[in-house]
Amino acid sequence: MAEITAALVKELREKTDAPMMECKKALTEAEGDLARAEEILRVKLGNKASKAASRVTAEGLIGLFIAADGKQGAVIEVNCETDFVAKNPDFIDFVNKLAGLVAAQNPADVAALSELAFGEGTVETTRTALVGKIGENISIRRFQRIATPNALASYVHGGRIGVLVEFAGAEEVGKDLAMHIAATKPKALNADGVAAADIAAERSVAEQKAAESGKPADIAAKMVEGSVQKFLKEVTLLSQPFVKNDKQTVEQMLKEKGASISQFVLYVVGEGIEKKTTDFAAEVAAAAAGHA
């Protein structure tokens, strides 16, 4: 049996971020074998999960699922730290199965989803094990489920953009709508659905531009209103020019096809997540200073 030295305990702690006493116990159980001790901690403490939990997850994958009858569907975003892991087969399988689980079980939120049975354990134990296996933090960010008497369509672009659409009409219309939404990324179905904060921000910019133009107050007011209305047309699905025929709007296309859309969900991986940027020059300088 190898001697359990302080240096060995320290090395194991640095690798796993496990408590010092747990590291010592694992090394004792492993008879001083560092690799075996690390495996023991992986099983006991979820491996690197605790260490990885503080790291930013801004990459990831969008999972989509529609039931065989086409009446229930779900879209989910699961994040990881790097694009490399987003292409890992185990990660992809985890995300796609989660989408199916959401559609089938209709959990209230991420916490409820995490407690559901999954494989030989729960969603959370599976996630933790995957963190240990892959070595990156993995987080379930958001999901949405739709159940409808009508029809559902979906589209995923490169695993990073996912769309789920509830509609009534021919199957081709649903596919066209999903692809259009992925391409143009509307904020809402119509003007009523656009967030007040987004409209206020656009109005503020328009007012500043109008003030700088030096135009009379009445003309400036019309300029502001015109800018806001243009913005709403650009970000609302029904008002957008249809991507397959920009001479008609999406609303006109739907009317022509005798179809309608009730709602849509659009997820873009990492949208709104602040990514950590590394200043490598500063990092190297700090490392050099530490060795000075």
From Swiss-Prot:
GO molecular function: translation elongation factor activity
Record-annotated membrane-spanning stretches: none
Family: Belongs to the EF-Ts family.
Signal sequence coordinates: none
Gene coding for it: tsf
NCBIfam families with a match to the protein in the record: tsf (TIGR00116)
UniProt-annotated location(s): Cytoplasm
Protein name in UniProt: Elongation factor Ts
Renumbered residue ranges of the record's region Involved in Mg(2+) ion dislocation from EF-Tu: 82-85
HAMAP family linked: EF_Ts
InterPro entries according to UniProt: EF-Ts_dimer_sf, Transl_elong_EFTs/EF1B, Transl_elong_EFTs/EF1B_dimer, Transl_elong_Ts_CS, UBA-like_sf
GO cellular component: cytoplasm
Record key words, sorted: Cytoplasm, Elongation factor, Protein biosynthesis
Function comment: Associates with the EF-Tu.GDP complex and induces the exchange of GDP to GTP. It remains bound to the aminoacyl-tRNA.EF-Tu.GTP complex up to the GTP hydrolysis stage on the ribosome.
